[in-house]
Amino acid sequence: MVVSVALRDYGPLTVACARTTLGAVALVLLMRVMGRRFPLGDRGLWPYLGAIGLLSTALPFFLLSWGQQYVPSAFAGISMAALPLFVLPLAHVFADEPLTLRRSAGVIVGFVGAAVLIGPGVFAGGGDMAAWGQLACVGAAMSYAVAAILTRRCPPIDPIALSTLTLVVGSVALIPLMLAIEGVPGWAGQTTGLAILF
């Protein structure tokens, strides 16, 4: 809902960038207050941090912001609710977690339930951009699912440090794109300005 309000006056890259950057700043400050250190010397972590940062922050935040220009917030929410349905099959292939008959049945029931919640007419009407918006929201859920699998395979790291560094990676990826495509954002008014801050 807040994203939809922010999109009234800001572009999707700006909204996504605000989410990652403000979150990164807040967590960096929290790390400092708690006296925790970042494992910057562990080179084995950085490929994971880079991939998780892109797939859990930069890409899904942008896809959700872009998609919500054309679809209701409810669709984006339902897409996120379907996240476990993507994680289970991926975990079977990449995380050595067998997809048993019971889990398979759960996935099928989950997909059916999501389809019922979304409704039969969700893909009807709205033009081509609505369909692309729906695909963007589903793509964001899939991106989160892949990031979840990578997080399971990631070497041990402080959870707060992991969250902080992945948001930093997302910010580093999004800021140049935002500046190049949408420019430096300004204060667009109290309603959308506060929405983008939250």
Stretch-by-stretch model annotation:
Residues C17-L22, P47, A51, L55, ...:
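Hydrophobic residues within alpha-helical transmembrane segments
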Residues L27, L90, L99-G121, A140-Y144, ...:
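Hydrophobic transmembrane alpha-helices of multi-pass small-molecule transport proteins
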Residues A24-I52, S65, Q69-Y70, V93-A105, ...:
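Membrane-interface interhelical linkers
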Residues M1-A18, W66, F123-R153, V172-L174, ...:
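Glycine-/small-residue-enriched transmembrane alpha-helix faces in small-molecule transporters
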Residues V15, P159-S163:
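Juxtamembrane helix-start motifs in multi-pass secondary transporters
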Residues I52-F61, L83-P84, I118, A140-A145, ...:
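Transmembrane alpha-helical core positions of polytopic small-molecule transporters
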Residues T14-V25, L55-S56, F61-P98, R103-S104, ...:
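Specific alpha-helical transmembrane segments that line the substrate/conduction pathway
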Residues M1, V28, R32, F62, ...:
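Residue-level hotspots within transmembrane alpha-helices of multi-pass secondary transporters
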